[in-house]
């Protein structure tokens, strides 16, 4: 059983695309989905109210964020599934999963820390660094997935960075225990802290992914503080996208 945890801020329209892509391309991946969302003004809140009313998926629990750290840790602690898939609102499943969730779970053997839906042999660009990705050479494979030693990679590179909520599947208890063990104040800090500490905290030195990824992020804007690299090629401010969504144009 895999549950989903989605984080969203000011991007109801982009979240809608993610939910629609789950419905079309990964309808049986997630048993239950919790969405923790926040809005910085009334217009963004209207976007989320519109999205809720559309009921794109039947298995969603909505939670308005009050305190990010507390809400996030509680969501991990109260998650009833053995596995959890982290997602953020600018992710999209762009094609069908090549296998079932049972096979994904079966690939999470004792030596595997996480399963990445975002990585694959076709992953060629690391948008945060704005450069080409060093390709996997040393890996194991079967007909649908590849496995590699993430501890042999720099934590600044995708293949050495297992702690991500952009489509990574973890053992819920393991991720929960790690998250409660170290202090953080916001999402990027959580990723950075846990990414560094987990190299020492876990003996699971492998990551697994489909041979070709099924999900990517669309960084056309950034709502995080401090900001990430976003929108260099195709800048779409979240305010404009939200207004088009409210007006029925998106």
Functional labels for PLM-detected ranges:
Residues 11-26:
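Short, well-formed alpha-helical segments that are part of the catalytic scaffolds
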Residues 82-92:
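Short beta-strand-to-loop acidic/aromatic patch adjacent to the donor-nucleotide binding site
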Residues 36-84:
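Active-site-proximal specificity loops/subdomain of glycosyltransferases
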Residues 2-6, 22, 31-36:
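Hydrophobic targeting segments
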Residues 13-15, 40-49, 100, 124-125:
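Short, charged/polar "capping" segments at the starts of alpha-helices
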Residues 97-183:
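Conserved catalytic core of nucleotide-sugar-dependent glycosyltransferases
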Residues 84-86, 113-118, 169, 205-211:
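A structural signal for short, well-ordered beta-strand segments and their strand-loop junctions
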């Amino acid at each position: 059983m895999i549950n989903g945890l989605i984080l969203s801020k000011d991007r109801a329209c982009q979240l809608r695309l993610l939910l629609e892509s789950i419905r079309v391309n990964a309808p049986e991946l997630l048993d239950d989905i919790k969405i923790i969302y926040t809005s910085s003004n009334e217009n963004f809140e209207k976007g989320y109210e519109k999205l809720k009313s559309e009921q794109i998926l039947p298995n969603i629990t909505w939670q308005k964020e009050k305190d990010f750290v507390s809400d996030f840790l509680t969501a991990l602690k109260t998650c009833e599934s053995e596995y959890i898939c982290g997602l953020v609102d600018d992710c999209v499943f762009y094609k069908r999963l090549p296998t079932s969730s049972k096979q994904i779970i079966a690939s999470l053997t004792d030596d595997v820390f996480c399963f990445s839906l975002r990585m694959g042999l076709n992953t060629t660009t690391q948008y945060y660094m704005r450069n080409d990705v060093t390709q996997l050479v040393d890996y194991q494979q079967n007909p649908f997935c590849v496995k590699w030693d993430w501890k042999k990679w720099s934590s600044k590179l995708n293949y050495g960075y297992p702690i991500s909520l952009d489509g990574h599947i973890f053992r819920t208890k393991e991720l929960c225990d790690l998250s409660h063990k170290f202090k953080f104040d916001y999402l990027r800090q959580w990723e950075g802290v846990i990414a560094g500490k987990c190299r020492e905290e876990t003996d699971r030195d492998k990551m697994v992914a489909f041979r070709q990824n099924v999900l990517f992020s669309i960084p056309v804007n950034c709502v995080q503080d401090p900001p990430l690299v976003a929108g260099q090629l195709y800048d779409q401010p979240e305010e404009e996208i939200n207004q088009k969504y409210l007006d029925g144009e998106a």
